[in-house]
């Protein structure tokens, strides 16, 4: 890419090039990512200034010939003109992506008449040209683009809409007459019309800023803001690729900085007790970077805050991370990037914190209130000591700001790799949404009206890549709310549709609310209650500070991932007491040790083989899905819609984390839309079935398959539970649908206990190197397998040496009950039958498979049943 000075010089040389004497030489500034709102803003601003203008209508047909664009253009009512357009050079400004623009130097050369074919691209243009000076004209164009069969089908209709309006078009009435919407593209271009030898790079920058100021009156401040972010990034990032993203505006301050993660129980389980971590309070402020650069001191937060100058010799750079209170101009530092020219980003937090207080003192020299956040190093795992530590931080009354949570900082990692978690009471967890009023006359059952309320839809932002990987679809009415140009960008709005509540994007706004006219605004909201088909949302405030971001077309409230992970704290509330005692419901807390590697791989292989039998099915239900251990297998199998049901909220929260992890780190050929339902499967089948059928988009006829891996033993306490399970499967499956159970086989377990003469309260063990690897404790006295209710204790690979109680599965009784409820047995097989296939799959793992592993695996099997 050339420099701007070089491009201007090349432009001037073109006029002395004899080979170009019959060519049209154009120097244009083209603005990118123009949506309807931006277009309308600039258009109305120019009309209001009563700048001389003209309107033209044209039809350009573009045909690709040997990688060149050959064009036929008809500027109505004149004749066709044939030419080819050849780009020579371009220069792209380093602006925020939503305000980005580039300078283009190109030539148009006449060519012979050519014949159009079906590959032609047709562009109908309604252009208003504002001659803002003798040197520059601004062209604002509404474009309709047609290709292939669209040309013959729609050309006449769009010519009428764009050109043949009832009244003669002027700059003042054009927008009203053609009423542009999502059918169109929008272009803003500035063309130089002065003497070539008079043009300078400074002239280009000046006119560019003039138009950008029309788009955003704060543009020059935004430019300074972006330059400040570049300065910070230059001291944090070493990758030229990442720095380029900052310079191009694709990344802003939020993407640059390590983010504080909303902590769920699943997160906390992984490092509880948090010995070695640092704890401080969460101030109710905004994230900000305090910078001392030369003689200037400023804070980069939601905007650029200039806080003064030393008036003395330039200082070495100091860069601090913290929370900023804009109204009071107060800064509370919690990390340091650079202190007096010394870069600290590769040091652990325990080292950086020593320099933080010194950096704060440098800020204080600028006569602003700056403090270091109070940190406590957690040194004890005792819950009582932890409680006192957390209380001393969260319940402290002497802080100069309101406290709305707790921050936990991991030691030992670099600045960018430091894990920082925030805990907030459920009430203080809020989300930012772009709110749009629901279009009328959609006739969507889920959009049922409520008297005294107006229905609005809640949107967040999402990348095109994540949208595809999560297999999301736009909600009904979406195309009426957002133009096609916005939907074709890399980042666009999507309805807030978390896995556990797909209709969470519905908001019924009270007619009596003090917040009026909320359509098109960004609102901070909290969940008050989850109703059957919608969420009872409360408006906290209108984010007036985000309205300008919204106009740029690159911001739509929270990012989808951030929003759903924050939402998890409504789904699985995390109490203050659990910070000290540890999260409740820690069934999945233990990790498998290395001795289970081969056996675990064998079980995984078998489950993978079973799930592949249902590959590419439309709707699959997993009963007892847990934290999503099989999620990757479903994704590999190309399941289109997966419904996971479990009563463990913490496990389901972990599953949702895995959903995003798979979407960002693993490649799958097919995308899967994931839904979760927090539900005890022992409850009545009718109630559970109704909840599943209420899932947005779930087919009336039912799912294609139901899978339950190593779960149904929980439902073998009584014959009533087994009956309920069979009824549930029948209600949820389509005719011909399949049930796939993997389970410990009660018959085989009883046989093992008899063979080893294990009596009541005695334990069968399988040891390796004097270590108990597998164990079953007999908790029943009967010598014969009962239909239900016989309990055993099982030592699980992830149970940290503790026995977990479960019921024996009488497979004969299970099959009998299912047959009674309209199912047929398709297949029943022991896991041991897969061992030869596993040997072929991985000879290295098979070699370390022990006899104990094989014995344990032989206790399991799978059952396949079909709904008649």
From Swiss-Prot:
Residues of the signal peptide: none
Binding site for S-adenosyl-L-methionine: 607, 624, 646, 710-712
Domain mRNA cap 0 methyltransferase: 594-868
Taxonomy, superkingdom: Viruses
Protein's name in the database: mRNA-capping enzyme
GO cellular component: virion component
EC number: 3.6.1.74, 2.7.7.50, 2.1.1.56
Induction statement: Expressed in the early phase of the viral replicative cycle.
Domains: entry comment: The N-terminus contains the mRNA 5'-triphosphatase domain, the central part contains the mRNA guanylyltransferase, and C-terminus contains the methyltransferase domain.
Subcellular location as annotated: Virion
Location (main, coarse): virion
Active-site positions on this chain: 282
Family stated for the protein in its record: In the N-terminal section; belongs to the dsDNA virus mRNA guanylyltransferase family.
InterPro entries in alphabetical order: CYTH-like_dom_sf, mRNA_G-N7_MeTrfase_dom, RG7MT1, SAM-dependent_MTases_sf
Pfam families in the record: mRNA_G-N7_MeTrfase (PF03291)
Quaternary organization: Part of the viral DNA-directed RNA polymerase that consists of 8 polII-like subunits (RPB1, RPB2, RPB3, RPB5, RPB6, RPB7, RPB9, RPB10), a capping enzyme and a termination factor.
CDD domains assigned to the protein according to its UniProt record, in alphabetical order: AdoMet_MTases (cd02440)
Record pathway: mRNA processing; mRNA capping
């Amino acid at each position: 890419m050339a420099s701007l000075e070089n491009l201007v010089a090349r432009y001037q040389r073109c006029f002395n090039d004899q080979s170009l004497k019959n060519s049209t030489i154009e120097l244009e500034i083209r603005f990118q990512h123009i949506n309807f709102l931006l277009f309308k803003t600039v258009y109305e601003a120019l009309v209001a200034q009563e700048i001389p203008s003209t309107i033209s209508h044209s039809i350009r047909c573009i045909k690709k010939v040997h990688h060149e664009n050959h064009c036929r253009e008809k500027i109505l009512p004149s004749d066709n003109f044939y030419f080819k357009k050849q780009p020579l050079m371009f220069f792209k400004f380093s602006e925020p992506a939503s305000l980005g623009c580039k300078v283009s130097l190109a030539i148009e050369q006449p060519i012979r008449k050519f014949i159009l074919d079906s590959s032609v691209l047709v562009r109908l243009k309604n252009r208003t040209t504002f001659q803002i000076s003798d040197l520059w004209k601004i062209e604002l164009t509404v474009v309709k683009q047609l290709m292939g069969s669209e040309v013959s089908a729609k050309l006449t209709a769009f010519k009428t809409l764009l050109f043949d309006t009832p009244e003669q078009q002027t700059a003042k009435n054009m927008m009203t007459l053609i009423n542009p919407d999502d059918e169109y593209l929008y272009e803003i271009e500035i063309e130089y019309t002065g003497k070539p030898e008079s043009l300078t790079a400074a002239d280009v920058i000046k006119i560019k800023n003039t138009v950008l100021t029309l788009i955003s009156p704060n543009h020059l401040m935004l430019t300074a803001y972006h330059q400040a972010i570049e300065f910070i990034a230059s001291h944090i990032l070493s990758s030229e690729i990442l720095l380029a993203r900052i310079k191009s505006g694709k990344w802003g301050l939020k993407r640059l900085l390590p983010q504080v993660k909303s902590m769920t129980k699943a997160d906390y389980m992984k490092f509880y007790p948090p010995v070695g971590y640092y704890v401080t309070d969460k101030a109710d402020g905004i994230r900000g970077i305090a910078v001392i650069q030369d003689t200037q001191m400023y804070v980069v937060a939601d905007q650029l805050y200039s806080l003064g100058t030393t008036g003395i010799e330039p200082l070495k750079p100091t860069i601090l991370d913290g929370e900023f209170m804009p109204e009071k101009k107060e800064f509370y530092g919690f990390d340091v990037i650079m202190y007096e020219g010394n870069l600290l980003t590769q040091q652990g937090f325990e080292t950086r914190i020593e320099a933080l207080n010194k950096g704060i003192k440098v800020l204080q020299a600028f006569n602003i209130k700056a403090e270091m956040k109070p940190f406590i190093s957690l040194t004890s795992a005792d819950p009582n000591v932890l409680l006192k530590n957390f209380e001393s931080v969260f319940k402290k009354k002497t802080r100069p700001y309101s406290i709305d949570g707790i921050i936990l900082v991991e030691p030992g990692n670099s600045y960018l790799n430091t894990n920082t978690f925030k805990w907030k009471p459920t009430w203080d967890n809020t989300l930012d949404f772009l709110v749009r009023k629901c279009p009328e006359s959609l006739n969507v059952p889920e959009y049922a009206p409520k008297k005294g309320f107006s229905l609005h839809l809640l949107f967040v932002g999402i990348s095109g890549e994540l949208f595809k990987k999560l297999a999301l679809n736009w909600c009904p009415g979406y195309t009426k709310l957002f133009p096609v140009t916005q939907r074709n960008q890399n980042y666009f709005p999507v309805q807030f549709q978390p896995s556990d509540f797909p209709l969470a994007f519905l908001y019924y706004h009270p007619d009596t609310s003090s917040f009026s006219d909320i359509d098109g605004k960004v609102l901070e909201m909290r969940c008050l209650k989850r109703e059957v088909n919608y969420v009872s949302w409360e408006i906290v405030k209108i984010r007036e500070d985000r309205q300008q971001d919204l106009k740029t077309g690159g911001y739509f409230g929270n990012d989808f991932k951030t929003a759903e992970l924050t939402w998890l704290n409504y789904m699985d509330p995390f109490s203050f007491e659990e910070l000290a005692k540890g999260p409740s419901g820690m069934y999945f807390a233990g990790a498998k040790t290395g001795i289970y590697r081969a056996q675990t791989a064998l079980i995984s292989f078998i489950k993978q083989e079973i799930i592949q039998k249902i590959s590419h099915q439309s709707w699959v239900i997993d009963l007892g899905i847990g934290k999503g251990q099989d999620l990757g297998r479903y994704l590999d199998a190309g399941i289109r819609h997966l419904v996971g049901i479990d009563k463990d909220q913490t496990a389901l929260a972990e599953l949702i984390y895995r959903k995003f992890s798979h979407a960002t780190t693993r490649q799958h050929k097919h995308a899967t839309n994931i839904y979760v339902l927090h539900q005890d499967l022992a409850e009545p089948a009718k109630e559970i079935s109704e909840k599943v059928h209420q899932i947005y988009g779930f087919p009336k006829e039912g799912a294609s398959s139901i899978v339950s891996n190593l779960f149904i033993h929980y439902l073998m306490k009584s014959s009533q539970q087994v009956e309920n399970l069979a009824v549930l499967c029948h209600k949820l499956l389509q005719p011909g649908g399949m049930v796939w159970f993997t389970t410990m086989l009660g018959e085989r377990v009883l046989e093992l206990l008899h063979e080893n003469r294990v009596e009541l309260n005695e334990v069968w063990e399988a040891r390796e190197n004097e270590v108990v690897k597998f164990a079953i404790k007999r908790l029943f006295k009967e010598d014969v397998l009962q239909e239900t209710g016989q309990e055993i204790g099982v030592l699980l690979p992830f149970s940290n040496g503790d026995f977990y109680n479960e019921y024996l599965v009488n497979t004969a009784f299970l099959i009998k009950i299912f047959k009674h409820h309209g199912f047929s047995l398709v297949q029943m097989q022991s896991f041991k039958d897969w061992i030869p296939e596993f040997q072929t799959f991985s000879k290295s793992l098979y070699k370390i498979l022990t006899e104990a592993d094989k014995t344990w695996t032989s206790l399991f099997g799978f059952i396949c049943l079909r709904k008649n």
